[in-house]
UniProtKB/Swiss-Prot annotation:
Name assigned to this protein: DNA topoisomerase 3
Active-site residues annotated for this sequence: 305
Sequence intervals crossing the membrane: none
Naturally occurring in which organism (per UniProt): Staphylococcus saprophyticus subsp. saprophyticus (strain ATCC 15305 / DSM 20229 / NCIMB 8711 / NCTC 7292 / S-41)
Protein's UniProt keywords contain Magnesium: yes
Keywords, ordered alphabetically: DNA-binding, Isomerase, Magnesium, Metal-binding, Topoisomerase
GO cellular component: cytoplasmic replication fork
PANTHER family: DNA TOPOISOMERASE 3-ALPHA, PROKARYOTIC DNA TOPOISOMERASE
Family the UniProt entry places it in: Belongs to the type IA topoisomerase family.
Matching InterPro entries: Topo_IA, Topo_IA_2, Topo_IA_AS, Topo_IA_cen, Topo_IA_cen_sub1, Topo_IA_cen_sub2, Topo_IA_cen_sub3, Topo_IA_core_domain
GO MF entry, a single one: DNA topoisomerase type I (single strand cut, ATP-independent) activity
Residue ranges of domain Toprim in the record: 2-135
Record: residues binding Mg(2+): 8, 104
Chain positions of site Interaction with DNA: 60, 167, 175, 307
Length: 712
C-alpha cells in the first residue's frame, strides 16, 4: 500500500519526487514502492456558475436576483479536467492507503486540496505536509513531522466559507449593477473599498490648501542652530522681532548633551513590505514582484514561502540561521556574511517571536547557494533585497552618539543636533567609515560663539502624495489610517485582521482595478477614473467601506479557531446579499459613459468606449452583450534604436506603426526588417497577429468569462 501526495503545482510535485526518490515517471504523476506524488494546477475544482444551477441564469436579468443556492455546487475546471481525472483515479486507487496534502500551507492551499478530495468522494485518511520552503532539507523535515489532516478541518471550513461568500455577494452585486445600469460594472468586498481608498486620497489632495510658515536659523562656529521657541510660526513678523532682538549679539553654549544610542535595521520582509520596496527601488509592480518571488521560491528554491504577512521567525529556525548565511556568501555580500559566522545566535534575537508568526514566517533566503549568473536581472534584484535584509538583521546594531547643543543668544535658545557614529554595525553594508565631528569636540558649556548669519526661511505645507502601486498596497494593509471610523473597535478590527484583502490577493486586486478601468496610473500617480467614481456612487455604502472585509476576516479567523460556525457565517452573507440587491434595484441613479467616442462598433453600430489599460488604450463596445473590442495603442517590448526606450504600437496589421517618445517612428515592415537578425527580440507578424486575434481583450479582463453570452 502507498501514500498519495497531492502538491499544488507540478514544480512542487517534482521537488517532492526528487527529494523522496520517487523516480518512476507516469502520465501526471511519479511513483515508487512507497509513494505516489501528483499535483493540481492551482485550482482543479471551482464554484459552479449560476447557469450551471439553472440554464435560465445564462441570460442576466435583474428580476432573477438574488441568486442564492440552497447548497453550493462545485465543478471541475474544463481546461484542467485531464489532470483532475488523473488525480481522481489515484485517490480512488486500491493501492493507495492514505492521502498526504502537500498544497501551499495556508487557507487557500487547503481549499485547493479539499475541493479535489471532496469532488473525488475521498474516504481515505489524510495527513498534512506543512512547510515554508521547498528545499530538500525542508521537505525531508516536513515529512518527518506530518500532521493529522483532521487538525486542519477548521482551516478548510474557513476557506470554503470565504469562497462561497465571495461568490454569493460578488455574483449578485455585479449582476445587479450591470443589469440595472446596462454597463459592465463590478462590485466586491475588497475591490470596492480599494477604489474608495484611492478616491479619499484624491479628495484630500483636491481639497488641500497650502499654508505658509516660517522658521529661523543662525550660523555660529561653522554649525547651524535652529530656533526652538518657536520652531516655526505662520506670522513672519514674530520671527523678525526675534531676529531684530538678537542681531549683532554673540551667544554662549548653555548645554551640551551626548547620548549613546543604538539603531536597528528594518524588520525582515513580509510580502507587502517587499513589494513596496521593490516598487520604490526598481519600479516593479506588486504583481511583478510576487511573480518573481514565486519563481525564486518554486524554481530556484532560493527563498522561503512568499505569501506571508509576518516579519518574524520562530525559535525552531535559529539553528538554520548560519546555513542561510553560508548560502548568501555566494553573492557580493560574501565578506559581510562571513564576518557574522563567528556570532552566536539565540531565540532572543529581536526578529524571533513565535507569537507573531501564524501560517508562515518572514521571507528569508533558504540554505541553497544561488548562482546569480543563472538568475534573470529581476530575480537577482529581488533575491539580493531579501539576502541583504536578512544579513542586516544578523549583524550588530548601528551605534552612535546623539549630540544636542543649546546656544543662548540674548533671551532666545537655538539648538544644533547631530549624530556621530561610534560603531557602524549593520550599516557597514552601506558605509565604509565612521563619522567624526572635530568641531563639536572643541566646544564645551559656556563657550562664547560669534553669530555670523541669521536667516528666516519661508516654507509651505504640501499635499499628501498620490498613491502609487507600492504605497496603495501598504494603505490596503492599514486602511484604518485613512478611513474615518468613529468606533475605535473598528480601528482595532481592521488592524488585527490585516486590512483590505490579504498579502496573497492585494496585488491581484490592484491589477484587476486597472484592467476594469476603475483606476488608472498617470506618471506613477494612481487616480480613480470616471467609471470608478460612478461605481462608488452606485454601490451600496457598506460595500465601499473596509469594515465589511474586516468583519469577514474576523469571523473567518474565528472559524479557523473553531469558535464560530461556518454555516452561520454563510447565512449572514445571504441576508447581506439580499440587502445589497434590493438597494441596487430601488436606486434611482443613472450611469453615464463619459468616455464615449464617436467611433461606431463594427458589430452592432453603437458608439464605442475608450478604455485605458495598464499598457495602453482600446475601444470597447458600450453594449455589455456585444464583446467587440479594438486596440488603439499598446506599449510593447520593442526597443527604439535611438534611445532604447520601449515603443508604443498604434493600429493593426499592415497599418501598424511603432512610435517612441523621442519621436522615432517605424512601420511594421521596418520593424520586421530591423529585427530579422535578432530573432529573440523580434516583434514579428505571428506574435502581432496572435495578440490582435486574442479576442482583442483587455489583459486579464475580469469580465471576459462572466459576461460572455450576456443578454438583456
Amino acid at each position: 500500500m502507498k501514500s498519495l501526495i497531492i502538491a499544488e503545482k507540478p514544480s512542487v510535485g517534482r521537488d517532492i519526487a526528487n527529494t523522496l526518490n520517487i523516480n518512476e515517471k507516469r502520465n501526471g504523476y511519479f511513483e515508487n514502492n512507497k509513494y505516489i506524488v501528483t499535483w493540481a494546477l492551482g485550482h482543479l475544482v471551482t464554484n459552479a456558475t449560476p447557469e450551471q444551477y439553472d440554464a435560465s441564469y445564462k441570460e442576466w436579468k435583474l428580476n432573477d436576483l438574488p441568486i442564492i443556492p440552497n447548497k453550493m455546487k462545485t465543478i471541475v475546471i474544463s481546461k484542467t479536467r485531464k489532470q483532475f481525472s488523473t488525480v481522481q483515479s489515484l485517490i480512488n486507487n486500491n493501492k493507495v492507503k492514505d492521502i498526504i496534502i502537500a498544497t501551499d500551507a495556508g487557507r487557500e492551499g487547503e481549499l485547493v486540496a479539499r475541493l479535489i478530495l471532496d469532488k473525488a468522494h475521498n474516504k481515505k485518511p489524510t495527513k498534512r505536509l506543512w512547510i515554508s520552503s521547498v528545499t530538500n532539507k525542508a521537505i525531508k523535515e516536513g515529512f518527518n513531522k506530518l500532521q493529522d489532516g483532521r487538525k486542519f478541518n477548521n482551516l478548510y471550513h474557513a476557506a470554503l466559507a470565504r469562497s462561497e461568500a465571495d461568490w454569493i455577494v460578488g455574483i449578485n452585486a455585479t449582476r445587479a449593477l450591470t443589469t440595472k445600469y446596462d454597463a459592465q460594472l463590478s462590485l466586491g468586498r475588497v475591490q470596492t473599498p480599494t477604489i474608495q481608498l484611492v478616491q479619499m486620497r484624491q479628495n484630500e489632495i483636491n481639497h488641500f490648501k497650502p499654508q505658509t510658515y516660517y522658521t529661523m536659523k543662525l550660523n555660529a562656529a561653522g554649525l547651524t542652530f535652529h530656533c526652538t521657541k518657536p520652531q516655526s510660526h505662520p506670522d513672519k513678523t514674530v520671527l523678525e522681532s526675534i531676529k531684530k532682538a538678537i542681531d549683532g549679539q554673540s551667544g554662549h553654549i548653555a548645554s551640551i548633551s551626548k547620548t549613546h544610542k543604538k539603531a536597528y535595521p528594518q524588520q525582515l520582509y513580509n510580502l507587502t513590505d517587499l513589494q513596496q520596496d521593490a516598487y520604490k527601488r526598481f519600479h516593479l509592480g506588486p504583481k511583478e514582484t510576487l511573480n518573481t518571488l514565486q519563481t525564486l521560491y518554486e524554481r530556484h528554491k532560493l527563498v522561503t514561502y512568499p505569501r506571508t504577512d509576518s516579519n518574524y521567525l520562530t525559535d525552531d529556525m535559529v539553528d538554520t540561521l548560519k546555513d542561510r548565511l553560508k548560502a548568501i556568501m555566494a553573492t557580493s555580500l560574501k565578506d559581510m556574511a562571513k564576518a557574522q559566522m563567528s556570532q552566536t545566535f539565540s531565540s532572543k534575537q529581536r526578529f524571533v517571536n513565535n507569537n507573531k508568526v501564524s501560517d508562515h514566517h518572514a521571507i528569508i533566503p533558504t540554505e541553497v547557494r544561488p548562482d546569480i549568473n543563472q538568475l534573470s536581472q529581476r530575480e537577482s534584484k529581488i533575491y539580493m533585497m531579501i539576502a541583504q535584509r536578512y544579513l542586516e538583521n544578523l549583524m550588530p546594531p548601528h551605534e552612535y552618539e546623539a549630540i544636542a547643543i543649546e546656544l543662548k543668544v540674548g533671551q532666545h535658545t537655538f539648538t544644533f543636533k547631530d549624530k556621530v557614529t561610534t560603531k557602524l554595525g549593520f550599516k557597514a553594508i552601506y558605509e565604509n567609515k565612521e563619522s567624526i565631528n572635530t568641531q563639536i569636540d572643541q566646544l564645551q558649556k559656556g563657550t562664547k560663539l560669534n553669530v555670523t548669519k541669521i536667516l528666516i526661511e519661508e516654507h509651505e505645507t504640501t499635499a499628501p502624495p498620490y498613491f502609487n502601486e507600492g504605497s496603495l498596497l501598504k494603505a490596503m494593509e492599514s486602511p484604518q489610517k485613512f478611513f474615518d471610523l468613529s468606533d475605535k473597535k473598528h480601528d482595532k478590527t481592521l488592524k488585527d485582521t490585516g486590512g483590505i484583502g490579504t498579502v496573497a490577493t492585494r496585488a491581484d486586486i490592484i491589477e484587476k482595478l486597472f484592467n476594469m478601468n476603475a483606476i488608472e496610473a498617470r506618471d506613477g500617480k494612481i487616480k480613480v477614473t470616471s467609471k470608478g467614481k460612478q461605481i462608488l456612487e452606485l454601490a451600496p455604502q457598506k460595500l465601499t467601506s473596509p469594515l465589511l472585509t474586516a468583519e469577514w476576516e474576523e469571523k473567518l479567523l474565528l472559524i479557523e479557531q473553531g469558535k464560530y460556525n461556518a454555516s452561520q457565517f454563510i447565512s449572514e452573507m445571504k441576508a447581506f446579499t439580499n440587502q445589497v440587491v434590493n438597494e441596487i434595484k430601488e436606486s434611482e441613479q443613472n450611469y453615464k459613459h463619459d468616455n464615449l467616442t464617436t467611433t461606431e462598433c463594427p458589430t452592432c453600430g453603437k458608439f464605442m468606449i475608450k478604455v485605458k489599460t495598464k499598457n495602453g488604450q482600446m475601444l470597447v463596445c458600450q453594449d455589455p452583450q456585444c464583446k467587440t473590442k479594438k486596440n488603439v495603442q499598446r506599449k510593447t517590448n520593442a526597443r527604439c534604436p535611438n534611445c532604447h526606450k520601449k515603443m508604443t504600437l498604434f493600429g493593426r496589421g499592415k497599418d501598424a506603426v511603432y512610435r517612441c517618445v523621442c519621436g522615432h517612428t517605424e512601420t511594421q515592415a521596418q520593424m520586421d526588417k530591423r529585427h530579422k537578425n535578432k530573432k529573440s527580440d523580434k516583434v514579428n507578424k505571428k506574435d502581432l497577429k496572435k495578440y490582435m486575434n486574442n479576442d482583442e481583450g483587455i489583459e486579464n479582463n475580469p469580465f471576459q468569462d462572466a459576461l460572455k453570452g450576456l443578454k438583456f
